[in-house]
Amino acid sequence: FEENGTWQGAGLLSERSKIRVRVVSRNANDRFDKAFWARRVEWAWQHRVTTMGTLALPGCEPDTTCCRVIFSEADGFPGLVVDRYEQVLVAQVGTVGMGRLRPLIYPLLLQTLRADGQDVRAVYERNDSPSRAKEGLPLEKGWWDAAGAPDSARLVVRENGLSFDLDLENSQK
């Protein structure tokens, strides 16, 4: 709310960050429940498919097997970036709010992409950015849920016909 009582929006609180609130919605009727986040995930994915066409659908475009799925504030997920490499989603969480929502959002991501015919099997977290300390978050990396995860954190991905050896654990996110 503004000082005069005008509604401005609702967001995720971070008591340790210099950015105390990250706005998620300016709609006073929104509730940050599972249905809300499911709509956000679906919107972000459909936005990728609409704007990128088959490039957003690894496997449909033989020259590209990776894409960005969630781009933080641009998609309404403050502090969350998710990229797809082959059958793995690689997530980086940079805010307390998104950290708390991981158990809700990751399954929604897998469910949404699978419902669209995408072969995604696991989520690998790269939460090792030093900026997490400003939020009071620990540095960590690894499989979010090992069920469905490949035996190795190394993949070969293609982008525009070029192949790249990708080390999910140690390469730059």
Please identify what each model-predicted range represents:
Residues 1-2, 92, 126:
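Residue-level recognition of conserved beta-strand edge/terminus positions
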Residues 7, 89, 163-164:
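Hydrophobic residues embedded in beta-strands of well-ordered beta-sheets
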Residues 4-7, 96, 171:
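Short, glycine-/Ser/Thr-/acidic-enriched flexible segments
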Residues 35, 39, 99, 103-107:
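Short, well-ordered alpha-helical segments
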Residues 1-86:
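Non-catalytic accessory regions of SAM-dependent methyltransferases
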Residues 23-31, 90-102:
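Short histidine-centered catalytic/ligand-binding loop motif
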Residues 72-77, 81-83, 102-172:
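Non-catalytic substrate-recognition/targeting regions of SAM-dependent transferases
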